[in-house]
């Protein structure tokens, strides 16, 4: 049976996630990462297939082998399994994937380095484990100070929420997708 009563979508009011313009939110149903790892295998596959083409370079700064497996299976090129202080190579990457927080760098310095290694149109994917609800805002502010724009917010939900259950924060990972800002915003307090 087909419902012949068509209902209009509600008119959006305000900005769910602060951004200029508003940032789209996407939900990916993927398994949760194992303890001490940044992502599940399914998350690695989604990131690689959605954010990179076969000839693109991907910089893998994530904990665990999941992204590397996805890169190999998809015949993509990768560079750097850990954040080495010596350098990230000379070639620009289309995708940089990292967990958060990053060791041995201030957030703004880390994002300045990411921006310097991004190819035009490239993205930085920052995976945030559930927990601190203010953390995504802090990450976006640091990225903006480094000249990166907040492009998309992905909610990686490992199970559907249940009515009346207060554990909504413990069922997902936030993935913030950042890209080079068209507007120059130096590393000042802006």
Identify the meaning behind each predicted range.
Residues 1-190:
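Class I S-adenosyl-L-methionine-dependent methyltransferase catalytic core
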